[in-house]
């Protein structure tokens, strides 16, 4: 298959070279993010590959349909940037990478929890200013806390297994589909019970219409005073304005955000010499008890390699069978 890969980072190039040969593809790589303005570049190709922050709206999809594209493979698990109704209408087969490396995100999540509970980022900032005092840096021990995991699929299970080594006081979880393996470590509770009982709430659920802004004013009010919130999943699971109010009131002791609901166009881009136009993000950055990372929980050597390989496997399967096990929508 002849493939055009958009938004290719330097760290992906070797993987594309190696796996395109393995799976018999001809792949051209460009750094441009996919969107309506560059969709015309797909003319002459059979399929394209994109990333999670690319603009895959109706306009862009119609343009690649006019170019003859029938296959679109995103190198991510998340697909919230893709207009599935338009893809189906235009007969474009879409596939994603549902499990590239659950360990990458789970390990990062544990790191975020330690960063919050031991105030590591705040301590590092103070040391940069030659402030070596201990005042304000007292932390809490994980073994005295209850962990609440929302979403116990592949990543959530690995998160649970990771925290189990710290001897947490208790581990509870919520998922509409209970994981039998997770039951070896956690007790499943209702969502309200998780909000009420957990000292640390960590999110590992996909974004759906039903759970959009699940962490909002009402749910935060149900939480313990001094709760820690971690989001290494989808940004729009959290209502950012409600989060800010919770931080200002002291209800929330700290938040770690590896995803943010308005991250598109900001995360994974260098904005050092630009004025911050997003007032909400600027306010979140101003809190000493908020850790923000640019959606890099997935970002390990193994995960990057797997994301590229599985993407090319998906496209090969489309070519050979007309369908794909990781298919999300087709005509």
Swiss-Prot record:
| Listed EC numbers | 1.1.1.110
Stored SUPFAM superfamilies: Formate/glycerate dehydrogenase catalytic domain-like, NAD(P)-binding Rossmann-fold domains
**GO MF annotation, one:** phenyllactate dehydrogenase (NAD+) activity
Q: Name one GO biological process term.
A: L-tryptophan catabolic process
Listed A to Z, the keywords are: NAD, Oxidoreductase, Phenylalanine catabolism, Tryptophan catabolism, Tyrosine catabolism
Family classification: Belongs to the D-isomer specific 2-hydroxyacid dehydrogenase family.
- Keyword NAD attributed: yes
Q: Could you tell me which PANTHER family the record lists for this protein?
A: 2-HYDROXYACID DEHYDROGENASE HOMOLOG 1-RELATED
Q: Which chemical reaction does it catalyze?
A: (R)-3-phenyllactate + NAD(+) = 3-phenylpyruvate + NADH + H(+); (2R)-2-hydroxy-3-(4-hydroxyphenyl)propanoate + NAD(+) = 3-(4-hydroxyphenyl)pyruvate + NADH + H(+); 3-(indol-3-yl)lactate + NAD(+) = indole-3-pyruvate + NADH + H(+)
- Taxonomically, the superkingdom here is Bacteria
Active site at which residues? 234, 263, 295 (proton donor)
Q: In which pathway does it act?
A: Amino-acid degradation
Coding gene? fldH
- Kindly give the Pfam families that the UniProt entry links to this protein: 2-Hacid_dh (PF00389), 2-Hacid_dh_C (PF02826)
Q: Specify which residues bind NAD(+) according to the UniProt entry for this protein.
A: 154-155, 175, 205-206, 211, 232-234, 258
User: Which class of enzymes does this protein belong to?
Assistant: oxidoreductase
Summarizing the function annotation, the protein's role is: Essential for the reductive metabolism of L-phenylalanine, L-tyrosine and L-tryptophan. Catalyzes the conversion of phenylpyruvic acid to phenyllactic acid, 4-hydroxy-phenylpyruvic acid to 4-hydroxy-phenyllactic acid, and indolepyruvic acid to indolelactic acid.
Protein's name in the database: Aromatic 2-oxoacid reductase
* Effect of pH on activity: Optimum pH is 8.
């Amino acid at each position: 298959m002849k493939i055009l890969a958009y938004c290719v980072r330097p760290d992906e190039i070797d993987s594309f070279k190696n796996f395109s040969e393995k799976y018999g593809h001809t792949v051209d790589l460009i750094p441009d993010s996919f969107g309506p303005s560059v969709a015309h570049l797909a003319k002459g190709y059979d399929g394209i590959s994109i990333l999670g922050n690319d603009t895959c709206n109706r306009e862009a999809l119609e343009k690649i349909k006019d170019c003859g594209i029938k296959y679109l493979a995103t190198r991510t698990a998340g697909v919230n940037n893709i207009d599935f109704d338009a893809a189906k209408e235009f007969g474009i087969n879409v596939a994603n990478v549902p499990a590239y490396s659950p360990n990458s995100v789970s390990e990062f999540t544990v790191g975020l929890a330690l960063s919050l509970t031991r105030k590591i980022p705040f301590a590092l900032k103070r040391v940069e200013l030659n402030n070596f005092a201990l005042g304000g840096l007292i932390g809490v021990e994980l073994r005295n806390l209850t962990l609440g995991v929302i979403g116990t699929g592949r990543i959530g299970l690995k998160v649970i297994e990771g925290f189990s080594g710290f001897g947490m006081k208790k581990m509870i979880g919520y998922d509409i589909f209970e994981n039998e393996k997770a039951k070896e470590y956690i007790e499943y509770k209702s969502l309200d019970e998780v909000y009420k009982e957990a000292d640390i709430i960590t999110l590992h659920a996909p974004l759906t219409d039903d759970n959009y802004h699940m962490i909002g004013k009402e749910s935060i009010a149900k939480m313990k005073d001094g709760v820690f919130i971690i989001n290494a999943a989808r940004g729009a699971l959290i209502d950012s304005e409600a989060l800010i109010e919770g931080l200002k009131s002291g209800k929330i002791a700290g938040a770690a955000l590896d995803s943010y609901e308005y991250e598109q166009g900001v995360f994974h881009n260098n904005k050092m010499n630009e004025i911050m136009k997003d007032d909400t993000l600027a306010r979140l950055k101003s809190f000493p008890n908020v850790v923000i990372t640019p959606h890099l929980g997935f970002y390990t050597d193994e995960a990057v390699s797997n994301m590229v390989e599985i993407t090319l496997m998906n496209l090969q399967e489309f070519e050979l069978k007309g369908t794909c096990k990781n298919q999300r929508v087709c005509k």
